[in-house]
């Protein structure tokens, strides 16, 4: 009798749970059909999947196995893979060393080498431990502690831990010169970007550069920015390429604007070497040689040298928090290449992306065609990932020991924990939501090639996703 009662209780709970799931599925279906009927989309341009976070059971799906451009929602796959393969406590180490010898007068007959590890946070202002001036001062102090008063060699930024191709395949040329298109170096510095403020003039007249946050005196900056009407805002774009010696600024800067525009730095490793040389000179240490980046030196051979000091990055969990909260593309490219380097000893973005694809094929049997990754950030419009693949990887994360750190890294948007993605004609959201019935849900929603304004489509997507809260 007791067995019969317990069995009846179990099946009653199961029946109620299934009823909730069916009810939610019906609501999502109705909302999705309404979403599509409002115009601006075809059947093939919208994909949605919703599943139970604990069991993986699919609650609703539409076009979930169609490859879609993801924009920055791809960052969740990079984040989860990094947590899984590198660990929450992983840290990068940057080493400064010297070659040659130091004589009794304090002359170093050799070079100072800054050996990069791909750390994307070095010199970033997001963490107390990574502030650029503090790092320069610490290294300068360590050099002086060795009794070095003059360096008869060079200051070299060694960025050779990666392949030197800073920009992944498929990134639009118009993006590369701007802060969000900053390429990844083996020795990143100040998030590989520089801030510029302008002095507006009469409408249509040149807007002069007022201030630079970084010393770019070694570059040729061609400024073609004009003053725009009040209220027109920031329409300034930077144009450059990795390792270039010049930057072109075009567009308009609103007459009433008071804003810092950020552009990418063509050679971050050189910038760091340049800044350290300047800091040493300011502190009384003479440097006879030039600042240089390893990739631009002919026949550079890395030397072990004698260690002067090391710098450790924040933990991976701390890096991924800002990576997802502020959608920093540089962080994604550094993490992807780091995964490839640590797991497979490869240096390129393509090889690293292929390793990530192979990992999820082996771990979750996700077809390789469902994970068309060309970068780690989602900036490439040519990325193609199915909603099902992204959803399965996110659902997998729910059971992992580092899940709390990943969940914390997701922004709160529309009162939901999810990562957004936006590039031309593409909007996406991927995240987690608990329904009123207490069911924990994982979801991925993409729209591609939509018509109408981004703001309007975003609100329509929020309205659809709000059903998951019911």
Positions of PLM-derived features:
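Beta-lactamase-like hydrolase cores
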Residues: 22-66, 93, 141-147, 467-470
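Residue-level preference for non-acidic, small/hydrophobic
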Residues: 56, 75-82, 155, 187, ...
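Soluble periplasmic/extracytoplasmic beta-strand elements of cell-envelope proteins
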Residues: 47-51, 59-61, 78, 95-97, ...
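Small-residue-rich helix-loop
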Residues: 59-61, 311-314, 326-329, 333-470
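Conserved serine DD-peptidase/penicillin-binding transpeptidase domain
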Residues: 35, 85-367
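Bacterial Sec-dependent N-terminal signal peptides
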Residues: 1-26
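Short active-site loop at a secondary-structure junction
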Residues: 61-81, 85
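Short, glycine-/Ser/Thr-/acidic-enriched flexible segments
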Residues: 21, 55, 119, 162, ...
């Amino acid at each position: 009798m007791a067995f019969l009662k317990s069995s009846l209780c179990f099946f009653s709970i199961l029946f109620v749970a299934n009823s909730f799931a069916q009810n939610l599925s019906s609501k999502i279906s109705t909302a999705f059909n309404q979403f599509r009927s409002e115009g601006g989309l075809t059947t093939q341009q919208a994909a949605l999947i919703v599943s139970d976070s604990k069991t993986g059971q699919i609650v609703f799906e539409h076009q979930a196995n169609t490859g879609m451009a993801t924009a920055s929602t791809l960052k969740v796959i990079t984040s989860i893979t990094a947590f899984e393969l590198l660990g929450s406590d992983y840290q990068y180490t940057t080493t400064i060393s010297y070659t040659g010898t130091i004589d009794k007068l304090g002359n170093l007959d050799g070079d100072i080498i800054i050996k990069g590890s791909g750390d994307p946070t070095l010199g970033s202002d997001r963490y107390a431990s990574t502030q650029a001036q503090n790092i320069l001062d610490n290294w300068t102090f360590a050099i002086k502690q060795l009794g070095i008063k003059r360096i008869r060699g060079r200051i070299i930024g060694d960025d050779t831990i990666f392949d030197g191709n800073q920009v992944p395949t498929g990134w639009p040329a118009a993006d590369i010169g701007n802060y969000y298109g900053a390429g990844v170096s083996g020795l990143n510095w100040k998030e590989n970007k520089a801030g510029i403020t302008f002095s507006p003039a009469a409408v249509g007249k040149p807007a002069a550069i007022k201030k630079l946050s970084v010393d770019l005196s070694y570059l040729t900056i061609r400024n073609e920015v004009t003053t725009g009407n009040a209220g027109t805002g920031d329409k300034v774009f930077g144009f450059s390429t990795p390792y270039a010696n010049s930057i072109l600024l075009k567009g308009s800067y609103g007459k009433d604007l008071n804003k810092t525009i950020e552009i990418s730095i063509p050679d971050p490793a050189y910038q760091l070497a340049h800044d350290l040389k300047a800091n040493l000179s300011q502190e009384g240490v003479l440097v006879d040689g030039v600042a240089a980046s390893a990739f631009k030196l002919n026949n550079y051979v890395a030397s072990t040298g004698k260690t002067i000091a090391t710098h450790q990055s924040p933990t991976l969990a701390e890096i991924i928090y800002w990576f997802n909260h502020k959608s920093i593309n540089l962080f994604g490219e550094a993490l992807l290449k780091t995964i490839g380097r640590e797991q497979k000893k490869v240096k390129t973005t393509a090889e690293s992306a292929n390793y990530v694809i192979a990992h999820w094929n082996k771990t979750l049997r996700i077809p390789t065609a469902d994970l068309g990754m060309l970068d780690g950030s989602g900036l490439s419009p040519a990325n193609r990932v199915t909603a099902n693949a992204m959803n399965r990887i996110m659902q997998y994360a729910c059971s992992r020991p580092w899940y709390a750190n990943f969940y914390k890294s997701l922004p709160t948007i529309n009162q939901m924990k999810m990562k957004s993605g936006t590039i031309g004609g593409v909007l996406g959201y991927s995240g987690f939501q608990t329904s009123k019935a207490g069911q924990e849900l994982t979801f991925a929603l993409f729209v591609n090639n939509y018509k109408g304004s981004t703001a309007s489509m975003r609100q329509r997507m929020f309205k659809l996703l709000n059903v998951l809260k019911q």
